[in-house]
Amino acid sequence: MVPEARPEPTESGHVSKGEGWFVLNARDSRWYAGPGRSAFCDLEGDQDFSQLGININVLEPGVPMAMYHWEADQEDFLVLAGEALLIIEGEERPLRQWDFVHCPAKAKHTIVGAGAGPCVVLAVGARVLSVDNPDWGGYTVDEVALRHDAGVPDDTTKPEEAYSRFTKRQPTAYREGWLPD
């Protein structure tokens, strides 16, 4: 029998502390936010899921979800609300509510908030090859991504280099307006 891993309250929201099944409302979960960065809902808690990464990102207009990158595993995205701009393989694609994006392994991509208000994106990614692996993926120079402030000046595989110009996101409680009613 698989035990319940009931999320525990913290100053920045409820957090799952162990293995097991649980139910958690996104508004009650721990979030991370920082200046010029997307806010994201930490659904996994203190222990990352071993097979699948999942989170909810809230992108203000012009704010990238991530630096332009590729991963050794597939990633998928579903726009839950608002508008965004997908940059994939050096091309731009507008996204709107209920658009689904599939990025097979090695597809270079990022998503940038667009439109008049916040965009909410569900992100899901496999964790077969990318966890604790030096060949997880990388950040590559791309002119389109750079034009949207979502690119790196030099190729790197180190997240700390790709995000060096940003303030690190800090744990926070859900803020009203991040998720649609």
Regions found by a protein language model. Give the residues of each.
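Short strand-coil-strand connectors
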Residues: 50, 87-91
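Short, conserved beta-strand element in jelly-roll/cupin
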Residues: 56-61, 69-88, 126-128
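Short acidic-glycine-tyrosine-enriched beta hairpin
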Residues: 76, 90-106
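A short, N-terminal "cap"/entry segment at the start of jelly-roll beta-barrel domains
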Residues: 1-51, 146-181
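Ligand-binding loop in jelly-roll beta-barrel domains
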Residues: 85, 105-132
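Surface-exposed, gly/pro-biased binding rims or lids
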Residues: 126-160
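Conserved short histidine dyad/triad with adjacent acidic residue
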Residues: 36-42, 55-71, 105
